[in-house]
Regions:
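RNase H-like two-metal-ion nuclease catalytic core shared by retroviral integrases
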Residues: 104-119, 126-152, 163-167, 193-195, ...
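Mobile genetic element proteins and their domesticated derivatives, centered on retroelements
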Residues: 44, 63, 69, 88, ...
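Charge-biased, low-complexity intrinsically disordered regions
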Residues: 36, 55, 170-173, 227
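Amphipathic alpha-helical packing elements
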Residues: 43-48, 127-148, 196-254
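Active-site beta-loop-alpha junctions of metal-dependent nucleic acid enzymes
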Residues: 64, 73-96
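Mobile-element integrase/transposase regions
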Residues: 1-62, 70
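Charged, gly/pro-enriched flexible loop segments at helix/strand junctions
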Residues: 171-206
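Generic recognition of stable, solvent-exposed alpha-helical segments in well-folded globular domains
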Residues: 41, 83-86, 110-114, 142-143, ...
């Protein structure tokens, strides 16, 4: 028993601060977001569990840049710390601009030493929202429903072999959404009596927001213009539909039908 406890508590090369203290070390950030430059994103996981949380299943890591609403998604097997770190690494490499900040909720897939050390090594500022305050992560929470649930629904994804096809889907879907689908950003939320009144900006695509943002270098914008010039929204949408069908066929053929 003593040997087991020692093995569990050994954290070679890391701080001796207890893991329970991480929530005290990682600062809470509630805004304002308006002054944050591109690269500061909100991040969350979406579970693909169907009607049951039992057993193994897929999770989508959803990252939304607050300044431009540029989004990237990555599906992974379960929501372990190492799997989540790997997903963040892929997302970071695929962003058109440097990742500067990651702002999750208080979930254990993000609030752990693997993620904290990864953020420090990559010069990514790690902050967190308050427990039970979804509004602290409103930008990514909105995308959870508008994108992940809209395109993948609530079906249980418990076939690991389907994940590569799901990530192929996300690659094309992200291109389609970032370049061609406009959305509005909430600028102000004012309480009037028992209701809230929200003020939104003009609807723009994330691509348009990147091109007009003064802090993004011209070489980044030039690369995106070249990419945009090679894309056809109709063909991308057809690809998205085809990849959804392919991914769910794999899931249907090898998944657990009783847990869908």
């Amino acid at each position: 028993v003593d040997l087991f406890r020692k093995a569990r508590s050994r954290r070679s090369g890391m701080s001796t601060t207890k893991p329970s203290k991480l929530k005290e070390i990682i600062p809470i950030f509630t805004g304002p977001w308006a002054g944050k430059p591109p690269g500061f994103g909100q991040v969350d996981t979406v579970v693909h569990c169907g009607a049951s949380l039992e057993g193994n299943m897929a999770f989508t890591v959803n990252w939304t840049d607050v300044a431009t609403l540029w989004g990237k998604r990555r599906i992974q097997w379960n929501k372990g710390q190492l799997a989540t770190r790997a997903s963040l690494s892929v997302i970071k490499e695929k962003l058109p601009f440097p990742m500067r900040g990651a702002h999750p909720d208080t979930g254990s897939e993000f609030i752990n030493w693997h993620i904290k050390d990864w953020c420090e090594a990559n010069q990514v500022e790690l902050t967190r929202s308050r427990p039970y305050h979804k509004d602290d992560n409103a930008y990514v929470e909105q995308k959870n429903g508008h994108i992940v649930r809209r395109f993948l629904g609530y079906t249980r994804i418990d076939c690991q072999a389907a994940l590569p096809a799901m990530n192929d889907l996300y690659e094309v879907l992200d291109q389609y959404l970032n370049h061609f689908v406009p959305s509005r950003k909430c600028l102000e939320k004012v309480r009037i009596g028992s209701r809230y009144r929200k003020q939104y900006d003009k609807a723009q695509t994330p691509y348009q927001r990147v091109l007009t943002h003064l802090s993004i270098p011209e070489d980044v914008k030039a690369n995106l213009r070249r990419e945009y010039g090679q894309l056809n929204p109709l063909l991308l949408k057809r690809q998205v539909d085809m990849l959804i069908a392919r991914a769910f066929k794999i899931q249907h053929d090898c998944g657990n039908p009783r847990s869908s």
